[in-house]
Amino acid sequence: ILIALLCTLPFLFFLKKWRRSYSGKTPPPSPPKLPVLGNLHQLGTFPHRSLQSLSRRYGPVMQLHFGSVPVLVASSPEAAREIMKNQDLNFSNRPNLSIPRRLLYDNHDVAFAPYGEYWRQIRSICVLQLLSNKRVQSFRRVREEETSIMVEKIMQLQKTTPTAAVNLTDLLTCLTNDVFCRIALGKKYGGTTTGDGEYHVRSLKKNLAEFYVLLGISPLWEYIPWLEWTRRFDGVDRRIEEVSRTFDEFLGKVIQEHRVRDKREDTTVVGDTVGLDFVDLLLQFQRENERSSSPVDDLTIKAVILDMFLAGTDTTVTALEWALSELIKNPRAMKILQKEVRGVAGSKGEIEESDLEKMPYLKAVMKESLRLHAPVPLLVPRESTRDTKVLGYDVASGTRVLINCWAIGRDSSVWEESETFLPERFLETSIDYRGMHFELIPFGSGRRGCPGATFAAAIDELALATLVHKFDFKLPNGVRVEDLDMSEGSGFTIHKKFPLLVVPTPHACTS
């Protein structure tokens, strides 16, 4: 029997190779996998880094298995272009992920909704009504006011304790939350408000943080279905229910407040919608289309607002935090930027958004920071809707797709000195991060690209320019800039592992 078995094994091996050759299929290169786990054991704490390492061995297009789920990983501009441009329609679907589905009202949002008529209608509403260039510009005053408030907070802290460290990460979080609350909800839910408003403050900040953490969880039972029984013990379901319930109650009250106000003021806006917040606009669209097949019900409004919180706050804070950290760690670049910003500002006390177009180095700094520190390094997963080929390799329908934009941004075959912070590389090139240049895609591209890139850039550029205009920065406790800890945290968005603590000194011309 043993002799027969030994003779059979080579036969089975060659039979498998013959069948693959005969079928004409050319699967992408794939690292060896384990039974049941597939390649899950190779992901580690930082999947974007682990996948970059694997791609250096197996190529820019490779296939892994997360448990029973086939996953295509793209790690080059050419592969990203093929998926997000040449075959955008074939890869426009989203996988049905359990945690986003439950957090976002059964995927009634824009980011995670499956491709189809509902998604097309909702995305169109977001692009045309909420995130158009005209709409972004209409909120310019809000961004400028809240940025000035942040500066005043830093000034007060510095006057009280001139040598004390300031948690810049916290201040940037407050800035983006306050800007977004005013733009989306019509007012801030922060500050010294008392009573019911204070409940909203604590609840909003706490639950937003938990919301972002939960989105970054990939439970093992999602890839290995027979382990689903373990979800009874991991506590994730309870956390999801708590966050979902709190947000549902909060957003329900916000919507009701808008309805009561509109009824009291008999608000019927025709044509001019300047000054309306996102909830106003969505409710107006709901009223105007109540007799049609419009998908905008209250549930959709809540899901879209949560989507906007994710895109408008967490990723924006992440981008600012990394940009400032890189500037502090690279004093030469900081001095160049401060010279540019202060030169444009001249004797003016405040930076205005109209000044930003005169600051090419500022824009280069943001591009370079996003190249090195994409807020969502693997982008939001896609899913193939049909059998197809990617760069000569066969990809089956239903394959999950990850685009490692973090690895693309650090690809030494694309970027000279790819690990070095050099904003100058963008001064003589038209490369941008809006989705047309696939070597720099922190916001994705194509149908499923982030529609809020312009919104995020407006906050990032104004806040960064204002901070370097108003202050000089050093690290607390005598820490040298070259020793600034640039470790990454983990999660859906990749923050610094530790908050950015600085000692700010008001610049002589602005103090």
From Swiss-Prot:
Main location: membrane
Transmembrane segments: 1-15, 61-77
Glycosylation sites per record: 90, 96, 167
UniProt KW keywords: Glycoprotein, Heme, Iron, Membrane, Metal-binding, Monooxygenase, Oxidoreductase, Transmembrane, Transmembrane helix
EC number: 1.14.-.-
Subcellular location: Membrane
Keyword Acyltransferase among record annotations: no
CDD domains in UniProt: CYP71-like
Family listed: Belongs to the cytochrome P450 family.
Identification of the protein by name: Cytochrome P450 71A6
Annotated organism of origin: Nepeta racemosa (Catmint)
